[in-house]
Amino acid sequence: MCRLLGYATAGFDLSLHAILGSQAVGEYRALSRIHNDGWGASLLSNPVEPAQLSDGGAPSPETGTRMYRSTLAAELDPVFDQIAEEPVRGALFHLRLASSNLPLILENQQPFFADGLSFIHNGDISDEQGRNIVTLPDSPVNEKTFLSTGGRSDSAMFFAMILECIGSGIPLDESVAQAVHELRRICPKSSYNCMVQSQDQLIVLCAAGHNEAASRVVEIYNRYGRGGKVRDYRVISYRALSDENGDPAGVVAASSGFPQDRNEGWTPLKNDEMLIASNRTGRFRLRSI
């Protein structure tokens, strides 16, 4: 059970602070008082050195990818400030609240990364008997693919299913959609809200199995005196970005939990709706799964 945030620009570097403003970044970070089981980020940027430069080792990359994952709560980790100030072309941020008693280990921290893709997920993937998908006797994914994610959780299994679809030659957005369809056969009422980042695209999906927050999540939020924040727990909203001239400059999307005023351009995704954005042009579109 996590809080997700991601953005894609029109090919230039912007920091999270530049996109949201310091107050909103602070309120997002403050969610880690509850979502305190670690955090992580995946950042895409344009390297200073020319692409494909032969420098004695592997040729220099066209896109630089950096990952950070920690078992510390974001509010207690000074690295969060540094990363939130880092100008990048695209980014994912993840605040974790561990589900189904899955262990608080670095392997289960998100984003996961494999085959050039970063992945974050909000939801507990369990069947109607309450059994987490990683405990079921028959795995829906190949073990080798599952291990390639580096994780051991239900979220890692979701990512592995996406990777298998991509390996069959299916485009990224359709791979995410097909992975959800396959997993819903086993765990129909689970949440598959997620974000995936490649060197070219940001995929944001709202795919909740039901509208109500899980009773465990409600209990935890009430314990922290923030029960009012749990009402729209499964909502993901997005806002188009503009540059200083008012021209389109990309898109930002995030889970609820901090102010996302519709008067400021925030729009909730419908359930089973996906946003597909380019982190090179900033253009984005919506589709149903």
What are these regions (language model features)?
Residues 1-119, 125-289:
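N-terminal segments that mediate ammonia production and transfer
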